[in-house]
Amino acid sequence: MSPFGQQLRELRRARKLTVNQLAVYSGISSATISKIENGKRGTPKPATIKKLAAVLKVPYENLMAAAGHIQAFPEEIREASEGYQSVYEIYQTAVTRGAEHLPIFNSQKWEHLSKQDIENLSKYFDFLSSEAKKRASSS
């Protein structure tokens, strides 16, 4: 399996999509998707990658870099974006739980929040997280 094929499979599974569902939503045949995932087909064309990125809800540039069509960001930029990686991981967790549609992931909703609003949200999140942890440990 190619690294791109492996990444494609992981993204598809994280979104709980079958090969056939990804095919229907992207307009790419299920045979082509299967061949890409299993490394039996070469690197997909940018147009194919664009369709996959849209359905999988990942940045087109990330898949283009994974496929080798564009160069990945230099190390300095990657190090500077560790905070963004954390946000991406939070979003990925939401995706695996089917919650990516919630307003908390809409950046426009954040524009009107004050510092105090965000601090209150953080406190409430800490409370919810603590309660969830208690429930998990008692089950």
Curated annotation (Swiss-Prot):
Protein's GO biological process: regulation of DNA-templated transcription
DNA-binding residues (ranges): 19-38
Alphabetic keyword roster: DNA-binding, Transcription, Transcription regulation
All residue ranges annotated as the HTH cro/C1-type domain in the record: 8-63
A Pfam family matched in the record: HTH_31
Coiled coil spans: none
UniProt superkingdom: Bacteria
Keyword Electron transport among record annotations: no
Molecular-function annotations in GO: DNA binding; DNA-binding transcription factor activity
Protein name according to UniProt: Uncharacterized HTH-type transcriptional regulator RghRB
Organism, as annotated: Bacillus subtilis (strain 168)
Gene: rghRB
